[in-house]
Amino acid sequence: IAKRGKAFNMKIIYHSRRRHLQEESMVGATYYPKLEDMLAEADFVVLVPPHTAETDHLMSREQFKAMKPTGIMINAARGPVVDNEALYDALKTGKILRAAIDVTDPEPLPLDSPLFTLENLVIMPHIGSAVVETRRKMFSMAVEQLMMGLRGERIPNCINPQVYK
């Protein structure tokens, strides 16, 4: 993400639990130890952490309040990383300009979710696996497991393991 942003002459800033010096030097990124300090400076906030107890509702009311009113948030992580109510409020009241999400909590969103009423929110289906490397791995796993099945071996990711009884 940082490399692509750099190609558009974006200033790259980031927050993480740990500093990544090698990646910083590759794209000229600036590390912010405090999330809210980074949010106050960022024009675009792209979320990509795993969902853990620590990152649950990482973006909630306080974090949206810290963002610029012209800020754009993109959640490409997991749905629960963003508090839906706080996101709705931030977009509805103009605390942030726009948002785009390809993950929701719950997945899928109920059809009556107020998020669907917002014109400044783009909701897309999750496409996290749609990268060449991941698709190659998926293809390799499928072929490997097909061959295992043809050889009569137990398939490790079998969705109906009762066939082995």
What is each of the regions a protein language model found here?
Residues H15:
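The conserved SAM/SAH-binding core of class I Rossmann-like methyltransferase domains
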